[in-house]
């Protein structure tokens, strides 16, 4: 019998216990491995689920192809997609980053997997074409730190739920179409350091809750329509560095609490409606680099405390109502580079302390009431590039060292009381590009006062006291395009070298004492568009070489001593719209060639010795508005064909030997009596108001036999007339009652016929109604922003008739707006430019209201570009001319009209092309006359895709709105289609940004020749400057037009 050994049993038990203790760690390891494997499996499953959710969202995009950046978004079977999918990053088994910026996506957020991506910390969907609204579900991503939906097409309001993003550091919603107010809940984002929601359509106030964002470093709210006052709480943000509230509708005062913002380097609040004084506490912002408060309604003095800001490099206070003197303390801003305080009401002298601004590059003091001499120290800065002092009351001499650094480019001194000689440093200042001395008392010998300027583009020395002869050295200023020396005391002959300045676009030597003859070599300046030599002592023949100046638009040779005939070859000036040869000794007949100047709008040949008859071919001058043939020896009749000259508004034929009836034309009917005096045999109708004798239809001598014959004929006729008169009387009595009823009905319905025409409006009204078949759709040729355009073939001309729509019609029927509208129409009918569609008049009747324009054969530029065959005919040369023509017209509207006219709707649909593809601006339905004493704030107008940001959002009308639209139009002409999103990209690019012409040019055209290509590239550079988001940084149309000339 076996008995168990107790000791053995104990030892066996001890062994098992020991073994069990050794196996416990191994079991834990196994459990841990199993746990890790399971968790990884779950993580892969979770990550794949998130990826599938993104794939489902991608499937809703409307434009994804195999070549798109998202073509890598396939097969999420494993977590490897985290490294292979474009724009996706993962951590700890979950997607945390989604960066799809600039991937060309077209879609919405309706199907975004909000509930499937709980760990997102970074979302960048900017620079795409997302549309629709921002979902409030974005507020669920509590871990989100970076959120960017900028540069899309999002609409609607900013959801208040975004205030729940408690970890958010950066919020960017830039350049969308978001509207409504900024939700106050944004003030709960206590960790946010940057908020950028500029360039939207936001309204309402800036929330005072922004004062809670104590970590905020940068706040960008510019280019919206925000209103109300600026919350003083913003002044309590200790970490704020950049604050941009510009281009809104903010009102009220600048908070004095801004003095607490010790770290702010950039403060932009320009182009608002801020009022009151600039708080002196701004001087406590000692870190400021840029302070821009221009274009507001600020009053009071410039605070002297600004001098405390030693770091300030840019100070823009222009276009306000600041008064008082310039504080000397501004001279203590030793870092100042750009100081602009123009267009205020500042008085007193320029402080001597400005001599301490040794880093100054730009100084703008123009359009104030400043006085006294310019302190010599103003020229101490060797970096001085732009100095604008015009339109003040400055006196004395210019500082001798005004071009000390040799970098001065722009010097504007117009309309002051400067005197004395031109400083030697200016004579030797090779850097000059633009110089204006107009309207002062500068003196000295013109031949010695100026040197050679290799970069000079424009110089105006008019209305001064310069004397002496012109120097031949001007020929060496080879970039000079505008040379204006009128109203001085210049003598001698014009040097022959002047006629070698082939780059000249404008030459004005008028009102001097210049003598000699004009040579045939005048034909060398074949780029000239404006030639003014009037008011001198020039003699001899008018050179026939003028016929070669085919770019000439304006010619004034009046008040000289030219003799002999008018050159018959002057008919070869296709662009000429103004010709004045009056007050000379010209003789012989008026050459037939003048009647071929189809663009001519003003012709003055008065006070000469011209004889012969007036040609009936004058009727060819359908654009002629003013004609003066007075004080000559003209004879014969005024041709009856003058009745067909529909544009004619002013005529003077006095003091000639003319006879016979005056033509049946409104210009003749409305002319004053002195327009016909001195012509003893001129006669008019019985109802004439010009004091002319009635025209007789019988001769003064008749034989007795003839008289008897007449009696035999007249007696029965008179009898018949009496009988007919009785019948007519009965009929008239019957009609009188009917007419009274009709007139009563008309008066009740406001049925007036109101017209502004350069011809008989009532007659034309009936003709137009008939020609358009009472506006039958078969005559419809286009639709504009304010009505439909019809083709009307009248007896003597084809016209375009724009019938205003009911909305526009009802608005102008309001008595409070009618007169303003009619005043604008009158102003527009006076526009005289070859690149502006002529507006003949306006007619308002209870049934129809319409505008009458000249007819353009090829229709709109947009239609031409949309048609492949037509677009190919519009070759590079023609496209260049289109751009230049529009530029010249806008320059005329902005700078040659008083008040200036802003079109506000420059687009390819409003550029019409004639038979020869010459471009003309049309549709002034939204035009605004910039009257100096009126507000320039107006409702939004214009065509989508062409509207300047400040007009679309801030509704501020300036000429720079047209400049922006011109930039878009120029790109469209080059590209052959609207540039679309390229515009917004270029608007935010630096002004010197370059583009590959090949990448954006119209591929329907062959590649341009090297010469043409260079010109197109120059035009492209101008377009980029026009698209600058800051209106003040855009060029003027005058500078563009001059450059194109």
From Swiss-Prot:
Q: Which residues form the signal peptide?
A: 1-43
Q: Where are the transmembrane segments?
A: 710-730
Q: What happens when the gene is disrupted?
A: Defect in apoplastic reactive oxygen species (ROS) production upon stimulation with some immune elicitors such as flg22 and AtPep1, and in response to SCOOP10 and SCOOP12. Insensitivity to SCOOP peptides including SCOOP4, SCOOP6, SCOOP8, SCOOP10, SCOOP12, SCOOP13, SCOOP14, SCOOP15, SCOOP20 and SCOOP23 leading to the loss of modified gene expression of several genes. Altered activation of MAPK (e.g. MPK3, MPK4 and MPK6) and root meristems distortion triggered by SCOOP10 and SCOOP12.
Q: Which residues does the record list as Phosphoserine (modified residue)?
A: 938
Superkingdom of origin: Eukaryota
Q: Which reaction does it catalyse?
A: L-seryl-[protein] + ATP = O-phospho-L-seryl-[protein] + ADP + H(+); L-threonyl-[protein] + ATP = O-phospho-L-threonyl-[protein] + ADP + H(+)
Topology class, membrane: Single-pass type I membrane protein
What PANTHER family does the record point to?
Answer: LEUCINE RICH REPEAT KINASE 2, MDIS1-INTERACTING RECEPTOR LIKE KINASE 2-LIKE ISOFORM X1
Q: Which organism is it from?
A: Arabidopsis thaliana
State the protein's name. Answer: MDIS1-interacting receptor like kinase 2
List the record's Gene Ontology CC terms alphabetically.
Answer: plasma membrane; plasmodesma; pollen tube
Please state every residue range assigned to the domain named Protein kinase: 775-1045
Give the induction annotation. Answer: Induced by pathogen elicitors flg22 and elf18.
The EC code for this enzyme is: 2.7.11.1
* LRR repeat locations: 92-116, 117-140, 141-165, 166-189, 191-212, 213-237, 238-260, 262-285, 286-309, 311-333, 334-356, 357-381, 383-405, 406-429, 431-452, 453-476, 477-501, 502-525, 527-549, 550-573, 575-597, 598-620, 621-644, 646-670
Which UniProt keyword terms apply here?
A: ATP-binding, Cell membrane, Glycoprotein, Jasmonic acid signaling pathway, Kinase, Leucine-rich repeat, Membrane, Nucleotide-binding, Phosphoprotein, Plant defense, Receptor, Repeat, Serine/threonine-protein kinase, Signal, Transferase, Transmembrane, Transmembrane helix
Which gene produces this protein? MIK2
Give me the Extracellular side stretches, as residue ranges. 44-709
Q: Where in the cell is it found?
A: Cell membrane
The UniProt subunit note reads as follows: Interacts with MDIS1 and LURE1.2. Binds to SCOOP12; this interaction triggers the formation of complex between MIK2 and the BAK1/SERK3 and SERK4 coreceptors.
Where Phosphothreonine occurs, residue numbers?
772
Q: Which residues carry this modification: Phosphotyrosine?
A: 853, 892, 946, 953
């Amino acid at each position: 019998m076996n008995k168990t050994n107790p000791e053995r049993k104990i030892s066996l038990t001890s062994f098992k216990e020991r073994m069990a203790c050794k196996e416990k760690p191994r079991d834990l390891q196994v459990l841990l491995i199993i746990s890790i494997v399971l968790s990884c499996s779950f993580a892969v499953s979770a990550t794949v689920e998130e990826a599938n959710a993104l794939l489902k969202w991608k499937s809703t995009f409307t434009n994804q192809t195999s070549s798109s950046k998202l073509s890598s978004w396939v097969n999420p079977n494993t977590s490897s997609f985290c490294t292979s999918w474009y724009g996706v990053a993962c951590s700890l088994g979950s997607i945390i980053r989604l960066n799809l910026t600039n991937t060309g996506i077209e879609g919405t957020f309706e199907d975004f997997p909000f509930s499937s991506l709980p760990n997102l910390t970074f979302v960048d969907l900017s620079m795409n074409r997302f549309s629709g609204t921002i979902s409030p579900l974005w507020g669920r991503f509590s871990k989100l730190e970076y959120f960017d939906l900028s540069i899309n097409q999002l609409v609607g309001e900013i959801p208040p739920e975004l205030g729940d993003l408690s970890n958010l550091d950066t919020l960017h919603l830039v350049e969308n179409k978001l509207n409504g107010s900024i939700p106050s809940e944004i003030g709960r984002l206590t960790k946010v350091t940057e908020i950028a929601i500029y360039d939207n359509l936001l309204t309402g106030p800036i929330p005072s809750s922004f004062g809670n964002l104590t970590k905020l470093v940068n706040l960008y709210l510019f280019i919206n329509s925000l209103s109300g006052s600026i919350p003083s709480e913003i002044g309590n943000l200790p970490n704020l560095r950049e604050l941009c509230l510009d281009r809104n509708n903010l009102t009220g005062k600048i908070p004095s609490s801004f003095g607490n913002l010790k770290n702010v380097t950039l403060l932009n609040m320009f182009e608002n409606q801020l009022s009151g004084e600039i708080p002196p506490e701004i001087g406590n912002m000692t870190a400021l680099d840029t302070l821009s408060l221009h274009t507001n309604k600020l009053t009071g003095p410039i605070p002297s405390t600004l001098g405390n800001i030693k770091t300030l490099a840019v100070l823009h206070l222009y276009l306000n109502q600041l008064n008082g003197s310039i504080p000397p303390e501004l001279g203590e801003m030793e870092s100042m580079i750009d100081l602009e305080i123009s267009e205020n009401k500042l008085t007193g002298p320029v402080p001597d302390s400005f001599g301490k601004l040794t880093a100054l590059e730009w100084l703008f003091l123009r359009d104030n009431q400043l006085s006294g001499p310019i302190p010599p120290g103003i020229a101490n800065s060797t970096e001085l590039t732009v100095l604008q002092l015009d339109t003040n009351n400055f006196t004395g001499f210019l500082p001798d060292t005004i071009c000390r650094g040799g970098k001065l480019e722009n010097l504007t001194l117009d309309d002051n009381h400067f005197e004395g000689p031109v400083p030697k440093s200016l004579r030797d200042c090779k850097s000059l590009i633009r110089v204006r001395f107009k309207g002062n008392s500068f003196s000295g010998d013109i031949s010695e006062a100026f040197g050679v300027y290799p970069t000079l583009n424009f110089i105006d020395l008019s209305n001064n006291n310069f004397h002496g002869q012109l120097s031949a050295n001007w020929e060496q200023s080879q970039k000079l395009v505008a040379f204006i020396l009128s109203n001085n005391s210049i003598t001698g002959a014009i040097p022959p070298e002047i006629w070698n300045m082939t780059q000249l676009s404008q030459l004005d030597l008028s009102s001097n004492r210049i003598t000699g003859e004009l040579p045939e070599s005048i034909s060398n300046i074949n780029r000239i568009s404006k030639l003014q030599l009037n008011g001198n002592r020039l003699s001899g023949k008018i050179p026939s070489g003028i016929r070669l100046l085919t770019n000439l638009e304006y010619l004034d040779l009046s008040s000289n001593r030219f003799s002999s005939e008018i050159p018959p070859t002057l008919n070869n000036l296709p662009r000429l719209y103004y010709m004045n040869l009056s007050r000379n000794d010209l003789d012989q007949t008026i050459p037939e060639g003048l009647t071929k100047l189809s663009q001519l709008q003003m012709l003055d040949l008065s006070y000469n010795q011209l004889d012969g008859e007036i040609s009936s071919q004058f009727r060819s001058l359908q654009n002629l508005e003013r004609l003066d043939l007075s004080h000559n020896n003209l004879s014969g009749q005024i041709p009856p064909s003058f009745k067909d000259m529909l544009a004619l508004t002013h005529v003077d034929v006095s003091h000639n030997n003319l006879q016979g009836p005056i033509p049946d034309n409104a210009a003749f009917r409305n002319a004053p009596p002195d327009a016909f005096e001195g012509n003893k045999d001129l006669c008019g109708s019985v109802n004439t108001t010009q004091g002319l004798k009635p025209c007789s239809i019988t001769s003064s001598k008749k034989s007795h036999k003839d008289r008897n014959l007449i009696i035999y004929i007249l007696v029965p006729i008179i009898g018949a007339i009496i009988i007919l008169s009785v019948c007519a009387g009965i009929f008239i009595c019957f009609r009188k009652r009917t007419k009274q009823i009709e007139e009563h009905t008309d008066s009740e319905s406001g049925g007036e016929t109101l017209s502004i025409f350069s011809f008989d409006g009532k007659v034309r009204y009936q003709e137009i109604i008939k020609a358009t078949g009472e506006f039958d759709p078969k005559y419809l040729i286009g639709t504009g922003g304010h009505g439909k355009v019809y083709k009307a073939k009248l007896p003597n001309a084809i016209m375009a008739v724009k019938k205003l729509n009911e909305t526009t019609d009802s608005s102008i029927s309001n008595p409070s707006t009618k007169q303003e509208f009619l005043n604008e129409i009158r102003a527009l009918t006076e526009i005289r430019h070859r690149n502006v569609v002529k507006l003949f008049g306006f007619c308002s009747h209870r049934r129809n209201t319409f505008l009458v324009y000249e007819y353009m054969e090829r229709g709109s530029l947009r239609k031409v570009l949309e048609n492949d065959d037509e677009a190919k005919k519009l070759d590079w040369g023609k496209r260049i001319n289109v751009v230049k023509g529009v530029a010249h017209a806008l320059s005329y509207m902005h700078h040659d009209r008083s008040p200036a006219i802003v079109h506000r709707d420059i687009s390819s649909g409003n550029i019409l092309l004639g038979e020869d593809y010459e471009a003309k601006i049309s549709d002034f339905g939204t035009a605004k006359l910039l009257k100096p004493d009126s507000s320039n704030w107006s409702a939004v107008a214009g065509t989508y895709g062409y509207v300047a940001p400040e007009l679309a959002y801030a509704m501020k009308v300036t000429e720079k709105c047209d400049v922006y639209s011109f930039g878009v139009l120029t790109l469209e002409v080059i590209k052959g289609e609207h540039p679309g999103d390229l515009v917004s990209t270029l608007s935010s690019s630096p002004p010197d940004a370059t583009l590959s012409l090949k990448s954006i040019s119209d591929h329907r055209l062959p590649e341009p020749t090297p010469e043409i290509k260079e010109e197109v590239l120059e035009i492209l550079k101008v377009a980029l400057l026009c698209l600058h988001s800051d209106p003040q940084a855009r060029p003027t149309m005058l500078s563009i037009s001059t450059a194109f000339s």
